[in-house]
Amino acid sequence: MTDQTTRLPIRRALISVSDKTGVVDFARELVALGVEILSTGGTYKLLRDNGIAAVEVADYTGFPEMMDGRVKTLHPKVHGGILGRRDLDGAVMEQHGIKPIDLVAVNLYPFEATVARPDCDLPSAIENIDIGGPTMVRSAAKNHKDVAIVVNAGDYAAVVEALKAGGLTYAQRFDLALKAFEHTSAYDGMIANYLGTIDQTRDTLGTADRGAFPRTFNSQFVKAQEMRYGENPHQSAAFYVEAKKGEASVSTAIQLQGKELSFNNVADTDAALECVKSFLKPACVIVKHANPCGVAVVPEDEGGIRKAYDLAYATDSESAFGGIIAFNRELDGETARAIVERQFVEVIIAPKISAAAREVVAAKANVRLLECGEWPAERAPGWDFKRVNGGLLVQSRDIGMIKAEDLKIVTRRAPTEQEIHDLIFAWKVAKFVKSNAIVYARNRQTVGVGAGQMSRVNSARIAAIKAEHAGLEVKGAVMASDAFFPFRDGIDNAAKAGITAVIQPGGSMRDNEVIAAADEADIAMVFTGMRHFRH
């Protein structure tokens, strides 16, 4: 069976949309192709106001819209026209005056936008639960053998092009039907998520607790890429992205050149980009195996990202080999040249890539170059997920940040202004290092990173070893710990290494002993009251 033999000509279409983007031009093209248009409510008025001939559904069914528009299309003459099997139900349709409807263009009430409003209450949300729309969508998708369903304005042009070629093929109708079921599935999921957070005890109207966890968790992800393999070659893998686009991320980034992203590339790029987003001034983050191995921040007038890259690389040049590099400023040609002439790199990501940088990196065809766009200074709340066997752990994103005024000085000596700058820098980095995490830093450059050890004191030892190996001086540096020190040995070792100031959450049963150790060594120590475990 060829495409030509499965093409479905369209004689009658029903159009009823909440999002009216492109619908006037779409309907005009259909009419030009000889298609009769049925429509409802606001869509009908819009078409008529633009000079497009259409029949109102109420006139076709002989039954008016009622109950403030709750009942418009729920009628046998509508659903019979959509669901009727052309090879089986023709006689029944003719007997009851039901005309075949060959194309349905419907999108649904804006439920998500409605419940996102701060003043939305339960009655408002309920009125924005679409009933007739999903019913028509599902009817048309079920009968895709004989009917085309269009739920996305982005498909209008392709549908018109197919009709001009003689009709929609079965493969095209099947794909449109799949999109339709994905659309209604996501819509029902949003409703269930919202209703699952309603606290009926607050008032008779019911109020959504926007920080609550719904009874069932519904989220839709769309396959963006099939991968050669997963974390290891014997594992199959694909990359799925959230259907609803959020802030700039690895999921929204555009790949400008290079080999296809691997499973590990995506995970590591996410770690690098999310870390570099923490800094307002020009910054560079180099990541290997999801851990920052070098981070630096340099103001524009002191060298910007070009200098920041040099300093980040200097932290651990061995680990930087084959790493991921992220910037929070546009990648310029000079910085790009410094990277490709110095090291092997898997991925470079930045909010923008200059033409000069693209030209430089083009000489290294395998380097993956990603442009992700700008992000807001304020991080948006959201959810983090961790899969366990048979379940899913869900938590709010760790967007906790601290400022100098949030720090609690617990030692006799207060940190200097420069130490405070370095402590906050090191704290931001420690948040993205696998626990137990220790970060040594000076002048907003990491000088040693200890990651992923079962004991915190061993992470501190590794950070010191890394610094020594890189030829970086620990004496005079500061130290950040992602969680509290359970014993004073971590501070004693820091003192021996020459650390002058420490930032940590506090909260240990032995905080007094840890503070005493810092005082004995004249180390300034501050508590954040916030932990940043990362497993």
From Swiss-Prot:
Please provide, alphabetically and separated by semicolons, the GO molecular function terms listed in this UniProt record: IMP cyclohydrolase activity; phosphoribosylaminoimidazolecarboxamide formyltransferase activity
Q: Does the keyword Translocase apply?
A: no
Domain MGS-like spans what residues?
6-151
Cellular-component GO terms for this entry: cytosol
Query: Which keywords does this chain's UniProt record carry?
Result: Hydrolase, Multifunctional enzyme, Purine biosynthesis, Transferase
The record ties this protein, via Pfam families, to: AICARFT_IMPCHas, MGS
Q: Which InterPro entries match?
A: AICAR_Tfase_dup_dom_sf, Cytidine_deaminase-like, MGS-like_dom, MGS-like_dom_sf, PurH-like
Q: Which SUPFAM superfamilies match?
A: Cytidine deaminase-like, Methylglyoxal synthase-like
Q: Which reaction does it catalyse?
A: (6R)-10-formyltetrahydrofolate + 5-amino-1-(5-phospho-beta-D-ribosyl)imidazole-4-carboxamide = 5-formamido-1-(5-phospho-D-ribosyl)imidazole-4-carboxamide + (6S)-5,6,7,8-tetrahydrofolate; IMP + H2O = 5-formamido-1-(5-phospho-D-ribosyl)imidazole-4-carboxamide
EC nos: 2.1.2.3, 3.5.4.10
Q: Has keyword Hydrolase?
A: yes
Pathway linked to the protein = Purine metabolism; IMP biosynthesis via de novo pathway; 5-formamido-1-(5-phospho-D-ribosyl)imidazole-4-carboxamide from 5-amino-1-(5-phospho-D-ribosyl)imidazole-4-carboxamide (10-formyl THF route): step 1/1; Purine metabolism; IMP biosynthesis via de novo pathway; IMP from 5-formamido-1-(5-phospho-D-ribosyl)imidazole-4-carboxamide: step 1/1
Write down the superkingdom of origin: Bacteria
Instruction: State any GO BP term from the record.
Output: 'de novo' IMP biosynthetic process
PROSITE patterns per UniProt: MGS (PS51855)
**Similarity annotation:** Belongs to the PurH family.
Note what the entry says on domains: The IMP cyclohydrolase activity resides in the N-terminal region.
Q: What is this protein called?
A: Bifunctional purine biosynthesis protein PurH
What is the native source organism of this protein? Pseudomonas paraeruginosa (strain DSM 24068 / PA7) (Pseudomonas aeruginosa (strain PA7))
Ranked from the top, the taxonomy reads: Bacteria, Pseudomonadati, Pseudomonadota, Gammaproteobacteria, Pseudomonadales
